[in-house]
């Protein structure tokens, strides 16, 4: 996630997917199982839910979605339309955390959290502060059924863009999303 590069098929790191994770090939570069490097891996188990294919309809993108509402996660792959549109997420409640990445062009990892409101976003692969970007979700908060993607944003809905969106809602025992203000004392109240 420290790159804005396009997605590439690279079989140099992961060797096998297993029932409880994966194994890596032995490598001498930062692409996989290197004994002297730091690695980060994010995994979400989503196959216990529904897999839905949806068609482009007007300004609304088409694609495929795997949703596990019990765990509060929906993984959505879609093709952008270049116009303000909506995508059904299948969670049954409004997502509180979204990550978007365009795979067929150099682009940021655009991130939204419920604490940001409808006009701000963060960049996952950056130390930058939040920035105002109403085009990102067309200044529209997610609802219990849909995520809005802005047509003026290459981060979420450029015409022909190949996108991946991770949508999360807080589910007790699985996850919690919100914010906190640090106070320098080692304890803080989160919301």
Spell out what each predicted region is:
Residues 1-191:
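Surface-exposed molecular-recognition determinants
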